Amino acid sequence: MLIPYSPHTIWKTICATLLLSLAFFSQAEQDDSVEFNIHMLDAEDRDNVDLSRFSTSNYIIPGMYYLDIRLNGRDFPRQNINYIEVADNHSVACIDPTLLKKLTINQENQKYIKQISPDCFDISQLPGISIKNDGGVLDITLPRSLMKYEESDWTPPELWDSGVSGLIFDYTLTGTSTRPNKGNNNNTLTGYGQAGLNLGEWRLRAEYQGNYSSEYSSNNRFDWNQIYAYKPLPDLAAKLTVGETYLNSQIFDSFRFTGANLQSDERMLPPSLQGYAPEIHGIANTNAKVTVTQNGRLIYETTVPAGPFVINHLQNTVQGQLDVRVEEQNGKINEFQVQTANLPYMTRPGSVRFNTSLGQSSVNNHKMQGPLFYQGDFSWGMNNTWSLYGGTLLTAKDYNAWSLGIGHDMGRFGTLSGDITQSYSKTYDNEKINGMSFKLNYAKTFDEYHSTITFAGYRFSEKTFRSFSQYIDERYNGINNNGYEKEMYTITGNKTFWADDAEKSTTLYLSYRHQNYWDKNTQEQYGVTVSRNFSIMGIEQINTNLSAFRTQYKGNTDDTLSFNISLPLGSGRNIGYNLQDNNGKVTQMASYADNRDYNNLWRIRAGLSSDKKANTDGYYQHRSQYAEINANASYQQDNYLAVGATIKGGFTATRYGAALHSSSMTSSTARIMVDTDGVAGVPFNGQSTTTNRFGIGVLTDLTSYNNVDARIDVDKMDQDIETRKAIASTTLTEGAIGYYQFPVRQGERLMAVLQTTDNKYPPFGAEVTNQKGESIGMVMEEGLVYIAGVNLNESLNVIWNGKTQCSITIPAEITDPLKHQSLVCQDR
């Protein structure tokens, strides 16, 4: 039976809705019991009202509830909350020990917490606390004066989430095919990634890499780089690693070993005490593959379009010297080295940062080499401005080293540190040698000048100084492939001019690195980048960029100059001009780029080189819920044709489900598995992922130990999808797989009029729930109810007086959801 709208019905519906709104408002704002004026309802309905559950402020019917948790505006996963009655018409929420720990109540205010049972604590008497149960959310708000920690931009350890157990597999595959006019064709395929298993707080990881070349078959291989396990130790603000790993020290040079490492993890500290990850700047003359390695281990690989590039996805745990290889599609290979930034080893007053390892050096085939060693270093904050640091590296024989240094915070003049390292070792010929190495580091941010000297350092090593890896190569293999360093100095900095004027704002980036050796050629790299946005002749946001780099490496000198200008056409499209000079060969290109669709970006270019040869190239990037794909192609007249692609993807599985997804950038990032109760196609975080047919999606590349959000893109959802909750926040430990279930429903919407079998309406305020117990509607006057997110023929329960009284069945067909459906509520 269809019942049309009438002005009288609409007016009654509005009044009923206002009445319920006032009920909830009174519930939240008053401390006394609430009485409702039901005379605003029709006389025939005044005796058919069930508002008993609203009559006492904050009264919740005793029982177990499955609720989302919100602490001071931060969301946590659902959990069972038991409400118990403590007096007539008064109930309190039982806070279990785990949730109580997350509140981080300081010792002074513990006296206000009442223990009712070992698993039940009453926190309602804490001064200034607010506890609300609204819309399936237990919302607790605490004054910061009650809490242990005052930092508003930092999540304390009690609130960290170790995630759920599960399997992960991430991969990056890069393929190229080159067809030169002269010589042989070459097809290559490289890949790297990680496989892993999370068990509680332990993370087991196996990192792999592989190479294939049709032209150079001797390079074809597949290796498991390292297999290790690690676990965060929040009480120590440290990380324990066992297995194959690399020494990560701010004092001693990195090397590969098998053993155990216990190290302070500064990511667990407040942001003001944390470091940063290194950046790599360069210029690609054509579409190119950029590879970053350290001691033969592949750390990062990607494809970049022609022009200046910046790689800033490296872990902040990467220390020491990095090898960068840029493989152009025209066959040219450019190599250089980057020294990662090493901030002065400063520590907060009275605190100690430490790093200790025990193991044996190992080579890439997992074989041990060299003696058993112990390494330990520390930094102690003596006071607000001075830190003392040092360390030792000891072996059972043949090699020992110690280091001692001091750091000073000079206030507005920056931070400076200096240290000395002494080594004692034996050569391949059993010759005993010893030497010293001296190092200075400086860092300063000039906020008032919008400038930063990110790192300035100097190091001098005597000819007889040996790092541990040099000792292993020399003592056991009789070789030294990397040379003996003599002097190294490096500086990187940036400056923003006219930072407060968007029309004039100009950014300058400078870098310089010099390394000479006792036994090989000097290496140098220096570069400058200037970028500016400006407007002219009514055209806004014109972008210009000028970059120049010189690299001297292995006796070769490479000079590159690049100038770019881009003019917006509106709606994410732009045209541009590029001039590039590589060792005197000039290429000029015109380009068109379309960035309107974030998930599908592309650019094409065409132009001429100084030898009158035509050049053209293109670049396309596609982001999907399953992987990220970067494809490129380039052609140079009478020279070559090349195509390439990179695919980054991953797979995550837990007991809640599994999903393919875009790849995780590094092994140290976290991820969140989102569950939408089987509803497919729900987009999250700007469409970073979309749930699959099973209602599972995975958000990757989330920063560990920082607050992160999983957000449903409500404006992008299909019309037949609804959710009671659109955002969840958490702070995940390193490598964790977070899990959050969102109450999402997909289905029909309808207005219905409910009647019992004796032709009476259910009482005003009765609740309609599905078989999961989720509330999906509330009965208003004359049995009117709005229902959403239900399936055809689905059975629903109607509850009043604290129990299910009858059930209704959604029709097999709904022709018009705006017309009232008459549904009979069958007795239970």
Swiss-Prot record:
Localization, UniProt: Cell outer membrane
What keywords tag this UniProt record? Cell outer membrane, Fimbrium biogenesis, Membrane, Signal, Transmembrane, Transmembrane beta strand, Transport
Q: Name one GO molecular function term.
A: fimbrial usher porin activity
Check the record and name the InterPro entries matching this protein. Answer: Fimb_usher, Fimbrial_membr_usher_CS, FimD_plug_dom, PapC-like_C, PapC-like_C_sf, PapC_N, PapC_N_sf
Any single Pfam family the record assigns to this protein: PapC_C
Q: Name one GO biological process term.
A: pilus assembly
Similarity field: Belongs to the fimbrial export usher family.
UniProt name for this protein: Outer membrane usher protein PmfC
